[in-house]
Amino acid sequence: MIRKPKLGSTGKLGSTIMKNALNRKDIELSYAIARKGNPFVGHNISEFVGDKFNLPIIDDIETAKNCDIFIDCTNAETFMNDSYSKYEKAGKSLVIATTAFSVEDIEKIRKLATNIPIFMAGNFSIALYNFIETLKFYVKKINLDTDIQIIEYHHNQKKDAPSDTSIAPSAKVSLDDTWCLNVTT
């Protein structure tokens, strides 16, 4: 059984991941962690995922040191300013489920990945990855003097723009195969 704490537990993605994890037999959600100052610290996660789960929301990553893996759904600023050094100290595997990192942030994360296993997944949608594979296929088939434009629209509460939904297609499609790939968010 995998023991994992979940950071960013009170957000949209965090709540969804947490609910799915809680309904699996092979995963034990060991902690629900929110950022310091979050008004839900001290509350129970049942407020977000249903009443059958009894786990308090805490705000201290270091309390969760006996976990097997961290899943972070916070945001780039919280990750880099508050959590990065704590993950480095904990030395545990890490899933980063947020976007909007700067180039400098990505370099720091790459450095951290030399010491601990890291998986970055800024988008958990199977549809996006199917879209990327389809895009790769068509990019190889089209004439090289054709421009491709991908326009991304989000709800008005989107906090991490540009999101991986817009970044991933251009990053995954080889630019050698593309004359121009323009992503607009």
Predicted regions and their residues:
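Short, ordered loop/turn segments at secondary-structure junctions
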Residues: R35, T99-F101, N123-F124, Y153-H155
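Extreme N-terminal starter segment of soluble prokaryotic enzymes
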Residues: M1-P5
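Rossmann-fold NAD(P)-binding glycine/threonine-rich loop
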Residues: E77-A90, A97-M120, I126-Y138
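Rossmann-like NAD(P)-binding element
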Residues: I61-N81, K92-S93
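Structural detector of well-ordered beta-strand residues that form the stable sheet scaffold
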Residues: S30, I58, V95, P117-F119
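Short, surface-exposed loop/turn motifs that are enriched in glycine and acidic residues
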Residues: M120-L128, H155-P162
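C-terminal substrate-binding/catalytic lobe of Rossmann-fold NAD(P)-dependent oxidoreductases
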Residues: L7, K12-A64, N143-T185
